[in-house]
Design a protein with these regions (language model features):
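Membrane topogenic/interface segments and analogous intrinsically disordered interaction regions
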Residues: 1-289
Length: 289
């Protein structure tokens, strides 16, 4: 029967309107056992979070300046709180890192200007403000970016705030217990038998404080990598494929910023940066991320 065959053939063909509707609605998350809310949370569906709003460029700049001011104010308050005890911190750091400083008169700090002590105290206070200001900067950055972040990304960013402070303290401790003793032992051993070293307060503390602040920032590398991967800005494979470029960048930055002309400090700093970079990638590889 020709009419019966035509009906059967028509029944076997999908309704074009229904096909278009299925394509427009995308995969059935509920049927697959998923939850639409979870998919939105992960950023798998939708164009962006509901809280994301367009703002004029001037409004963005104004908010960014305001949040930067908060970071500077917090750092300044911490610096003012530390300044009264800065001389005690100077004596502690000096006696800790200059070999024989307490017993050898020549190893005591030398002042070659009337304001060197005050300037050094200000630098010590500024270092304390910088270390405390790092997590504040992370938090203010989170508040600035919050409207454009998915809930999952917000959780990651909030968890980064205390992590940033912990990593900064670990970096300062690493500089205090590992980097600085090695550098000053090298300096004193290098000049023994050739000249008597008279350590100037300004130059010596510039090296100490710069390396401490530098290490506080360097130890943020694992945090930056983890955040970038968790927020889908990059992948571990992408970073591993370009590791030599990162190594070269680390070496360049270490030799450019380090105040040590002998090359000892830049090598230690660059080795630390590369170790943190590779260690983070190894941890991600081990956990399957």
């Amino acid at each position: 029967d020709a009419s019966a065959g035509a009906d059967a053939e028509a029944a076997s063909v999908d309704d074009p309107a229904q096909s278009v509707g299925d394509a427009a609605t995308g995969p059935d998350l509920t049927a697959a056992g998923g939850d639409t809310a979870d998919a939105v949370d992960e950023g798998l569906v939708g164009e962006g979070p509901a809280s994301d709003e367009e703002m004029p460029l001037a409004a963005h700049i104004e908010e960014m300046v305001r949040r930067l001011a908060v970071v500077l104010v917090v750092g300044g308050v911490v610096g003012l709180a530390v300044f009264p005890v800065a001389d005690q911190l100077i004596n502690f750091l000096w006696n800790s890192h200059i070999p024989g400083a307490e017993a050898i008169t020549d190893r005591r700090p030398r002042l070659y200007g009337p304001l060197e002590l005050v300037v050094t105290e200000l630098k010590v206070a500024a270092l304390a403000g910088f270390v405390v200001g790092l997590p504040v900067a992370v938090y203010e950055t989170y508040l600035f970016m919050r409207p454009g972040l998915f809930p999952r990304e917000r959780r990651y960013y909030l968890a980064a705030v205390p992590t940033s402070l912990v990593l900064a303290l670990i970096g300062v401790a690493f500089a205090h217990f590992v980097v600085l003793p090695a550098i000053f032992a090298y300096f004193t051993a290098y000049t023994t038998g050739t000249a008597v070293v008279a350590f100037g307060l300004k130059e010596t503390f510039s090296l100490i404080l710069v390396l401490m602040g530098y290490m506080a920032l360097v130890f943020q590398i694992p945090l930056f990598i983890m955040l970038a991967i968790m927020m889908n800005l990059t992948t571990r494979i992408w970073l591993e494929d370009r590791r030599l470029l990162f190594w070269g960048g680390f070496l360049g930055v270490a030799f450019l910023i380090s105040p040590d002309p002998t090359g000892m400090a830049p090598i230690i700093v660059a080795a630390t940066m590369i170790t943190l970079f590779e260690g983070t990638l190894a941890l991600l590889r081990w956990t399957g991320n």
